Swiss-Prot record:
GO cellular component: cytosol
Ligase keyword on record: no
Family from the record: Belongs to the shikimate dehydrogenase family.
Catalytic activity: shikimate + NADP(+) = 3-dehydroshikimate + NADPH + H(+)
Oligomeric and partner information: Homodimer.
Active-site residues (renumbered): K69
Pathway this chain belongs to: Metabolic intermediate biosynthesis; chorismate biosynthesis; chorismate from D-erythrose 4-phosphate and phosphoenolpyruvate: step 4/7
Organism: Paramagnetospirillum magneticum (strain ATCC 700264 / AMB-1)
Protein name: Shikimate dehydrogenase (NADP(+))
Length: 276
């Protein structure tokens, strides 16, 4: 790496678990780019200082992960309309004039993963059921609404939180009582779990799939483990499945292109490398 190397990184607290440095490092090496992508562990009380220093330190930008994705919104000079709508920033880009732009690429990452993982799925093929109403759900619902999904049935343990999401994002969102989540799967062409239930160390998602058509696509945004209990049960009944790793990989593409000037590809080789 030379003195003219372009720099980017990921801001989080903690950040040691992030696969982003491995992911971006793969692309940098593959493309022969003079650059580096660094993990930046930043406590919440130091976030503003670090954000302000990024342009001076020669950074082209950074990814933002938990717990900073909402707090960083008030620290940027320009906010992308989608990031404002979703209510979170996951990508920072230093503009040529040194100002900071906040973007959200999670919706893009989710949708591209779905398209690559199940090319035959069409947004207009029927309703989608979305489980959860956290930050990830906001990106998923925005992506589905923008793609033209006719109805999005949103179920969350806290109905109030689901109702807030629906009001904030608008579009064809129907809030479903948590007790009726299984029944709401009837006629759906897509099921997406946006919660952490099913992740290693967490309990499994309690969801009966009996009402879900066997032709429906089942997507879990969890990727540790790669095949969650939900995906295993869906496979056993014949549903096509899409795992969550691709969302992480695809959401990284726009940021990498903005920082390093080349658009990377999400390949099977990359998937294997990030998982290894």
């Amino acid at each position: 790496m030379s003195g003219k190397a372009r720099l980017a990184g990921v801001l989080g607290w903690p950040v040691s678990h992030s696969r982003s440095p491995r992911l971006h490092g793969f692309w940098l090496e593959q493309m022969g780019i003079d650059g580096a992508y660094l993990p930046l562990a930043v406590a919440p009380e130091h976030l503003e200082t670090v954000i302000r220093a990024l342009p001076r330190m020669g950074f082209a930008g950074a990814n933002v992960t938990v717990p900073h994705k909402e707090a960083v919104m008030r620290l940027v000079d320009h906010l992308d309309p989608l990031a404002r709508r979703i209510g979170a920033v996951n990508t920072l880009v230093v503009r040529q004039d040194g100002t900071l732009e906040g973007r959200n690429t999670d919706a893009y990452g989710f949708f591209e993963n779905l398209r690559q993982g199940c090319p035959l799925w069409e947004p207009t093929s029927g309703p989608a059921a979305v489980i959860g109403a956290g930050g990830a759900a906001r990106a998923v619902v925005a992506a589905l609404a923008d793609a033209g999904v006719p109805e999005i049935r949103l179920a969350n343990r806290s109905r109030e939180r689901a109702a807030t999401l629906a009001a904030d994002l608008g579009g064809p969102v129907t809030v479903v009582d948590w007790a009726e989540r299984a029944e709401s799967l009837e006629g759906c062409a897509l099921l997406v779990n946006t919660t952490t239930l099913g992740m290693t160390g967490q309990s499994s998602l309690d969801l009966d799939l009996a009402a879900l058509p066997t032709t429906s696509v089942v997507n879990d945004i969890v990727y540790v483990p790669l095949v969650t209990d939900l995906l295993a049960r869906a496979t056993a009944r014949g549903n096509p499945i899409v795992d969550g790793l691709g969302m992480l990989l695809h959401q990284a593409v726009p940021g990498f292109e903005a920082w390093f000037g080349q658009r990377p590809q999400v390949s099977d080789q990359l998937r294997a490398f990030v998982l290894s």
